[in-house]
Swiss-Prot record:
Its EC number is 2.7.1.1. It comes from Oryza sativa subsp. japonica. Plants over-expressing HXK6 exhibit hypersensitive plant growth retardation and enhanced repression of the photosynthetic gene RbcS in response to glucose treatment. InterPro entries: ATPase_NBD (IPR043129), Hexokinase (IPR001312), Hexokinase_BS (IPR019807), Hexokinase_C (IPR022673), Hexokinase_N (IPR022672). It catalyses: a D-hexose + ATP = a D-hexose 6-phosphate + ADP + H(+); D-fructose + ATP = D-fructose 6-phosphate + ADP + H(+); D-glucose + ATP = D-glucose 6-phosphate + ADP + H(+). GO terms for molecular function: ATP binding; D-glucose binding; fructokinase activity; glucokinase activity. GO terms for biological process: glucose 6-phosphate metabolic process; glucose metabolic process; glycolytic process; intracellular glucose homeostasis; response to glucose. It is a single-pass membrane protein. It is found in: Plastid, Chloroplast outer membrane. Induction: By glucose or fructose treatment in leaves. This is Hexokinase-6. Residues 43-497 form the Hexokinase domain. GO terms for cellular component: chloroplast outer membrane; cytosol; mitochondrion.
Length: 506
C-alpha cells in the first residue's frame, strides 16, 4: 500500500470521526435543550400552582375573621341598612312544624324550568308522614317568556289534575278547604306569610306584567279560573322550606343551608333582635330569617385573579361574591380557569392549548367531583374525563396529578369558606361556645341540602371537619350537621300545615 493511500484513508477516517462527534454534539445539545425546556415548563407550572396555593389559602384565623364579618353583615341587614349586602329578609314564618300536624296538605315548588306538585297526609306525632306523592312537570319554553296569566293558568291546571288523582291514602275532612304551601324561588318582597310581590324574574324567565305583583294572588286567581278550591297559606323560598322540613324531623334544627348549584341560608332569629321588625312581636318570640347569604362580601374573603375575572365576566358583576366562591355553579369553572392558565403558561396539556378549555363553564362541578374522587394509581378516570370534556387525548401522569391538586385546592377553599359562614350563624345565635355559667349545653342542628353537599364527598367531609375545628372539640360535640335531602318541597307543605286556617281548632 502506498504512502498516499494511507494518508488518504487516515483523512477519511478523521473526517468520519469528526462528523460523528459533530452529530453527537448536536444530539446532546438537542437533548439538553429539550431537558431544559421541560425543566422550564415544570418551573412555570410550579409557579402557577404556588400562587394558587397562596391565594386560596384559608388558615383558621382567616376563617374566624370571615365569620366575624358575616355576623357584622347579618346585624347590618337586620337593621335594614340599605348598603348591607345581606338582605336578611323577614320570612313571616314564626311557627315552625312541631310534628303534631294532622291532615292533607299540598305544596307547589316553582324554582326553575320544572315545577313539582306535592301532597302529604300527616298523622301527628305518632304517624308523622302517613303518605306522600309528587309529580314533576316541565314548563313549556314559550310560557317562560309569555304572560303571567298563561304561566299561572298552566300551573293551576296541572295542580287541578294532580288533585283529581287523590287516592284512598289521602283524606280531607268534610267542609274543609285544601291548603297549599308555595315554594317560590325567585326574588320576592314578602309582606306576610302568604303574600309577596315579585322583584324580578331569574333563571331564564322573562314574563311581562308580574314584577311588582303579588305572586300568591296571581296563583289564587288562576286556581279560581280552574275551579280549584285551594288556599295558599304559606309562601316560602326553598331555604326556609328546608328549615321547616328539618325542624319537623328534629326539633333542634336552628338553621338550614343549601349548597347546590346556588347557595343560601336561613335561620331562626329572636324576634326582639330584629331592629327592622315593626308591629307586635310574634307569640312564638321567633322569626325565620332568609339571609340570601350568597351576596355576602368582605375584604377578608381570599379572592384571586381567577375569582375577579369570573365575576367581571358574569351576568351580575359585583354581586353574589360568596356564592361565586363556594357553590356548585362556579367551582368547576374556577378549576377550568386555573387549568387554562397552566395550559398557556406551562403547556400542561401539550404545546397547543385545547380549544374546549377556552369554553366557559364547560367543566361542571359534578365532573370536577368525579375527577377529584379518582383513587386509581394512574388517575385513569380523571384522564378519561379530561379526554371526554376537554378533548385532550393523551395526558401525562404529571398533568393528571396537577389537575387533581387544582380540584383539591378549589374544593377545599369552597368548603372551608362555607363552614366559616355556618360558624358565623352559630356565633350570631350564641351557639358557638360552651355556656360559661355551667348550664347544660344546647344541641344545635344545621339542616343541609343541595347536590354539592350531598354528592361531593370530599367537599362535605372538609366542610364538617372545618366547622368542628372552628368550634373546638367541646362546643362541636353539641353541633350536628344533618342532610335534609329534598327538604324544601315537603317543607312548604309542612308550613301550610303549621299556618293552617284550621290550626286553632285542631
Amino acid at each position: 500500500m502506498g504512502k498516499g493511500t494511507v494518508v488518504g484513508t487516515a483523512v477519511v477516517v478523521c473526517a468520519a470521526a469528526a462528523a460523528a462527534v459533530g452529530v453527537a454534539v448536536v444530539v446532546s445539545r438537542r437533548r439538553r435543550s429539550k431537558r431544559e425546556a421541560e425543566e422550564e415548563r415544570r418551573r412555570r407550572a410550579a409557579a402557577v400552582i404556588e400562587e394558587v396555593e397562596q391565594r386560596f389559602s384559608t388558615p383558621t384565623a382567616l376563617l374566624r375573621g370571615i365569620a366575624d364579618a358575616m355576623v357584622e353583615e347579618m346585624e347590618r341587614g337586620l337593621r335594614a341598612d340599605p348598603h348591607a349586602p345581606l338582605k336578611m329578609l323577614i320570612s313571616y314564618v314564626d311557627n315552625l312544624p312541631t310534628g303534631d300536624e294532622h291532615g292533607l296538605f299540598y305544596a307547589l315548588d316553582l324554582g326553575g324550568t320544572n315545577f313539582r306538585v306535592i301532597r302529604v297526609q300527616l298523622g301527628g306525632r305518632e304517624k308523622r308522614v302517613v303518605s306522600q306523592q309528587y309529580e314533576e312537570v316541565a314548563i313549556p319554553p314559550h310560557l317562560m317568556v309569555g304572560t303571567s296569566m298563561e304561566l299561572f293558568d298552566f300551573i293551576a291546571a296541572e295542580l287541578e289534575s294532580f288533585v283529581k288523582t287523590e287516592g284512598e291514602d289521602f283524606h280531607l275532612p268534610e267542609g274543609r278547604q285544601r291548603e297549599l304551601g308555595f315554594t317560590f324561588s325567585f326574588p320576592v318582597h314578602q309582606t306576610s306569610i302568604s303574600s309577596g310581590t315579585l322583584i324580578k324574574w331569574t333563571k331564564g324567565f322573562s314574563i311581562n306584567g308580574t314584577v311588582g305583583e303579588d305572586v300568591v294572588a296571581e296563583l289564587s286567581r288562576a286556581m279560581e279560573r280552574q275551579g280549584l278550591d285551594m288556599k295558599v297559606t304559606a309562601l316560602v323560598n326553598d331555604t326556609v322550606g328546608t328549615l321547616a322540613g328539618g325542624r319537623y324531623v328534629d326539633n333542634d334544627v336552628a338553621a338550614a343551608v343549601i349548597l347546590g348549584t346556588g347557595t343560601n341560608a336561613a335561620y331562626v332569629e329572636h324576634a326582639n333582635a330584629i331592629p327592622k321588625w315593626t308591629g307586635l312581636l310574634p307569640r312564638s318570640g321567633n322569626m325565620v330569617i332568609n339571609m340570601e347569604w350568597g351576596n355576602f362580601k368582605s375584604e377578608r374573603l381570599p379572592r384571586s385573579d381567577y375569582d375577579n375575572a369570573l365575576d367581571f365576566e358574569s351576568l351580575n358583576p359585583g354581586e353574589q361574591i360568596y356564592e361565586k366562591m363556594i357553590s356548585g355553579m362556579y367551582l368547576g369553572e374556577i378549576v377550568r380557569r386555573i387549568l387554562l392558565k397552566l395550559a398557556h403558561d406551562a403547556s400542561l396539556f401539550g404545546d397547543v392549548v385545547p380549544t374546549k378549555l377556552e369554553q366557559r363553564f364547560i367543566l361542571r362541578t359534578p365532573d370536577m367531583s368525579a375527577m377529584h374522587h379518582d383513587t386509581s394509581h394512574d388517575l385513569k378516570h380523571l384522564g378519561a374525563k379530561l379526554k371526554d370534556i376537554l378533548g385532550v387525548a393523551d395526558t401525562s401522569l404529571e398533568a393528571r396529578y396537577i389537575t387533581l391538586h387544582v380540584c383539591d385546592l378549589v374544593a377545599e377553599r369552597g368548603a372551608r369558606l362555607a363552614a366559616a359562614g355556618i360558624y358565623g350563624i352559630l356565633k350570631k345565635l350564641g351557639r358557638d361556645r360552651v355556656p360559661s355559667d355551667g348550664s347544660q349545653k344546647q344541641r344545635t342542628v344545621i339542616a343541609l341540602d343541595g347536590g354539592l353537599y350531598e354528592h361531593y364527598k370530599k367537599f362535605r367531609t372538609c366542610l364538617e371537619a372545618t366547622l368542628a375545628d372552628l368550634l373546638g372539640e367541646e362546643a362541636a360535640s353539641s353541633v350536628v350537621v344533618k342532610l335534609a335531602n329534598d327538604g324544601s318541597g315537603i317543607g312548604a307543605a309542612l308550613l301550610a300545615a303549621s299556618h293552617s286556617q284550621y290550626a286553632s281548632v285542631e
